[in-house]
Amino acid sequence: MPDNSSIANCCAASGLAARPSWPGSAEAEPPETPRAPWVAPMLSTVVIVTTAVDFVGNLLVILSVLRNRKLRNAGNLFVVNLALADLVVALYPYPLILVAILHDGWVLGEIHCKASAFVMGLSVIGSVFNITAIAINRYWCICHSATYHRACSQWHAPLYISLIWLLTLVALVPNFFVGSLEYDPRIYSCTFIQTASTQYTMAVVAIHFLLPIAVVSFCYLRIWILVLQARRKAKAERKLRLRPSDLRSFLTMFAVFVVFAICWAPLNCIGLAVAINPEAMALQIPEGLFVTSYFLAYFNSCLNAIVYGLLNQNFRREYKRILSALWSTGRCFHDASKCHLTEDLQGPVPPAAMATIPVQEGAL
């Protein structure tokens, strides 16, 4: 899936940046049209909220699976892997985007620019492949339960996860040969420039978005058909052995897929349209639409943990336990520090006062 800055380097018109370049360089050009004063505060708020929810939410997902034995299964290892893919952008690229917004330009140098763009791509493509793997896992678990445990045990899952990240790295390699990693001032982000090759951009959209969407849609469609058959016929239900936990897991991951598709579809549609007809489409796409589609895609990284909490009772229960434990620990530290502070303010009890305190008989 492309970070579609395929219109980032097009001619400056309709308020589009003429060419991403480093601040202070000889090639740097000011934007044709200044931004509205509310744009930077709004984008910074979106980035801060997304980063905070992403960090806390995905940590809760990981801790929930590690703590709860009911959640510690082969299927949820892919969920943890997806949470890690979402978490990594909250640790590196998003804070750098916030710095760029606050400085109204990139001030962290070329190395951080290229590295943040690479990490962003790693997270996005890793998420796509993880969601696809989860759909295949759910399909196999529900539709082919007889062979599921032989092929998808907890010992096999790490191999599949390693394969996912290997394919993710392979998918990122062509970007270093086809185009460069540069800063796009419209989205305050360093991203992959897709103008070098129309064919490459179309291939990226097809392989990283359309193909996974097709595979996931097929898997979930087959599951829906079998679920409906199981509800209508008691015999089919016995054959399928549909457990409530399997259905809950399926519905949760189906919701994750729908949210992902909604968040990333606008940006990929823009990239595909520009790839098909770059000269005509690049100038017709409003900058506001492009920026909105980009930040909608960024926002997706914090939504999965919310979906788990809303739709999966085991995750919701574990969230409450973790947050309650953290709250209790925080109160203990607060009460202890308050107690020590009171003792320090009152000072030691003088001997004369000690003498006036009656000692009860038998007291220790």
From Swiss-Prot:
GO biological process: camera-type eye development; G protein-coupled receptor signaling pathway; glucose homeostasis; negative regulation of cGMP-mediated signaling; negative regulation of cytosolic calcium ion concentration; negative regulation of insulin secretion; negative regulation of neuron apoptotic process; negative regulation of transmission of nerve impulse
Extracellular side: 29-45, 103-115, 180-200, 277-287
Record key words, sorted: Cell membrane, Disulfide bond, G-protein coupled receptor, Membrane, Receptor, Signal, Transducer, Transmembrane, Transmembrane helix
PROSITE patterns: G_PROTEIN_RECEP_F1_1, G_PROTEIN_RECEP_F1_2
SMART domains named among the record's database cross-references: 7TM_GPCR_Srsx (SM01381)
Membrane topology: Multi-pass membrane protein
Signal peptide range in chain numbering: 1-28
Keyword Membrane: yes
Pfam families: 7tm_1
Gene3D superfamilies: Rhodopsin 7-helix transmembrane proteins
SUPFAM superfamilies with a match to the protein in the record: Family A G protein-coupled receptor-like
Transmembrane annotation, as ranges: 46-66, 82-102, 116-136, 159-179, 201-221, 256-276, 288-308
Cytoplasmic-side positions: 67-81, 137-158, 222-255, 309-364
A GO term, aspect molecular function: G protein-coupled receptor activity
Subcellular location: Cell membrane
PANTHER family on file: B2 BRADYKININ RECEPTOR/ANGIOTENSIN II RECEPTOR (PTHR24228), MELATONIN RECEPTOR TYPE 1B (PTHR24228:SF54)
Family: Belongs to the G-protein coupled receptor 1 family.
Protein name stated in the entry: Melatonin receptor type 1B
Source species of the chain: Rattus norvegicus (Rat)
Lineage of the organism: Eukaryota, Metazoa, Chordata, Craniata, Vertebrata
Gene transcribed to yield this protein: Mtnr1b
